Amino acid sequence: MKVSTAITGLLFLLVLNMLLGAEEIPKFGKVSDEELQMTAIPEDPEADAVVLFDVGDLRIREGSEKYYLTMERHTRVKILTEKGKDYASVSIPFWHEDRIHDLKAHTVLPNGKKIKMDKKAVFEEKVDKTGYKKFALPGVEVGAVIEYTYKLESDYLYNLEPWFFQNNEFTRLSQYSVIVLPYFGYSVFFRNTLDMEPETEDILDPQQRRKLTRYIWRMKDQPPIRKEPYMRTLNDYRAAINFQIREFKSPYAYHKYISDWPDLVKEMREHYDRNLDDDKSLKEIVQSEAPDSLRAPERIKKLYAFVRDQIETGERGYRAVEKSPEEVLKDRQGTGVEKNLLLVNLLMLAGFDAHPLLISTRYNGRIVEQQPRLTQFNYMLAYAKYGSRTYVLDTRYSYCPFNLLPVDDLVETGLVINKGTGGFIQIPKPRALNMLHCANNLTLSEAGHLDGEAMVRFEG
């Protein structure tokens, strides 16, 4: 399992330049004859395209009033088949408050002719808190090379931009570099790859007249990761690197951030506690919808049905909430997460052991429990216990029956955010009415043949 390491702005300062520096990346528009004449690659002869290189350079900068980060990305792809032309349609995701600018893209035909993308071809879409910059490169044909570059700017320094070293097609070179200021310390998490020691370069910050370190992670000749049946998300399988702030230490201030699961639980509990309350209107709902005269399971069911049916669902929501349960009740509208926190609040006022439960939905990927990383979670459910029974509830969809979760919530584990150190729980599986069991005992021969026996059992 991948274990976190740490970097700071001055880490490895004494061993600078002992390792090789970053590879020389061709400038935008400088496409070689070899790239133009390529018709296939020996590593993947059936490939529809090949990622010639995908390079990201991230840097934390110090402005006059704030710190911020910039990330410059440069991607070049060779189109090998008709199907490969689909890669000319590009979608760049970004957090809704981030900015993308200096976007350039063009197509280089096999004869060397360049077709520049019109800036009017770029448009933007938003889904919940995520934006997408979308465009289609012009004049793409088999044998062409497509290339684009852009800059992302963000004020969000808690988690640096993650990086995936693998794509849907074979990747010749994937490289990510990070420059942080001396005040910042980050934990580094690897997934689906062995931990990599970064290469380092010594650079000069001309504004502050100080030395900084550029950390470089590079992977070459990476096989493609393609969508397969029953696969939740490609991100469960792609080699990746993630960053989460560990500390900030300047001459004037010091702040310690998340370093383990209890830290994470404490931080999120403080956020939710700031919104939980015992407002009169909430108590009145408990008394009217779930009086003490009802049995406990029925009270839980009644409160669930009230929030599900009487509060309109806006966006899906993320981990955090912007409106308190009192405000959600007053507006009769909230995100899925805000509705679930309202349910938690009502259950607590009704005397139940109830807490927020963080999960990573199916499309977001599986949780790595050895990595205390907040960005692994993208949604929050309501969790309650009564006696030996556990209830995990999501009020987002009006069609969802009591104690039955929507498909995207059907994951293995969730993190209980209680007033202690929290902990992972197994999310109850729905009762199966029909089931198919398959068991195979197979032997793979040196010639590549599978021999053995299979047993199939139907139930229900």
Question: PLM ranges: what are they?
Answer:
Residues 103-164, 200-238, 439-441:
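A surface-exposed beta-strand-loop module
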Residues 75, 144-146, 176-178, 303, ...:
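Cysteine-centered nucleophilic/redox motifs
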Residues 23-92, 429-458:
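Early extracytoplasmic/domain-onset interaction patches
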Residues 8-17:
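Bacterial N-terminal signal peptides
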Residues 337-428:
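Hydrophobic/aromatic-rich core segments of domains that either
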Residues 92-117, 173-188:
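Solvent-exposed beta-hairpin/edge-strand motifs
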Residues 23-36, 153-158, 166-168, 175-316, ...:
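Secretory-pathway-linked proteins and extracytosolic
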Residues 312-334:
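Short, conserved helix/loop micro-motifs enriched in His/Cys and acidic residues
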